[in-house]
A protein has these predicted regions:
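Bacterial N-terminal signal peptides that target proteins for export
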Residues: 1-15
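Hydrophobic alpha-helical membrane-insertion segments, chiefly the h-region
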Residues: 16-21
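Hydrophobic alpha-helical segments
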Residues: 22-218
Length: 218
């Protein structure tokens, strides 16, 4: 996961500052009150500050996205942060495939923030723009490499049928070891939880950005 550490430090400062600048802008008069007003570091209490400092070191969205509701429960938030950290930067699954799995969940949930945050990361990690575009269009991507096809089939089958068939598992064993299969399962489940957190909190992309999924889009 050395490649992740190369881009994360530069991405954090630029993206986090941009997210904060956008999310702290005044909302249109017709918009409803946010369920969780965006917090900044100087608003955090003593229980929240240590977690906030950790988040700001690695997050591409600052304290936005799932971190905004999550930090309201700092003990739980710390446990989740530790899980996020492993599944993003220490997982045994290669970065490109890990981000692909996250996008699959983001598309299933039509999670605006999840897709907005992770589509650029997937592309940066080497996932083909065509694969990203076809997935966004709710299609099974064509021209996938063997390991990409395994990720798509494994994650999609597990999350839509609540099981993994012997055939799909056998295909996974051809390209992944036991630890990678466990980590792939965990990242899929984790980002379902992230999508749920984002949906509950009604977190949105920055107001000056276009949501990835249009209203009514299946």
């Amino acid at each position: 996961m050395h490649s992740a550490s190369v881009w994360v430090s530069s991405l954090t400062m630029a993206a986090a500052s941009g997210w904060f600048a956008a999310t702290m802008l005044a909302q249109p008069a017709t918009s409803k009150e946010p369920r969780f007003p965006q917090l900044t570091m100087d608003q955090l209490n003593e229980a929240q500050k240590p977690l906030g400092e950790q988040i700001m070191k690695v997050s591409s969205v600052g304290l936005g996205g799932p971190y905004n509701p999550m930090i309201r429960s700092p003990v739980l938030g710390q446990r989740l942060y530790d899980l996020f950290y492993y599944l993003r930067w220490q997982t045994s699954v290669p970065t490109k495939l890990n981000e692909f799995a996250i996008l699959i969940i983001g598309r299933q949930w039509r999670s605006q923030v999840e897709w907005y945050a992770h589509a650029p990361l997937a592309a940066k990690a080497g996932l083909s723009p065509d694969i990203i575009a076809e997935l966004k269009a709710s299609k099974r991507p064509s021209n996938m490499a063997e390991d990409e096809a395994v990720v798509y089939d494994f994650v999609t089958e597990l999350t839509t049928t609540q099981k993994v068939s012997d055939e799909t598992y056998a295909q996974a064993k051809k390209v992944f070891n036991d630890q990678q299969i466990v980590d792939l399962t965990a990242v899929a489940g984790n980002y379902v939880m992230v999508a749920m957190m984002l949906a509950m909190a009604e977190e949105t992309v920055p107001p000056d950005k276009e949501p990835p999924f249009k209203v009514g889009e299946k």
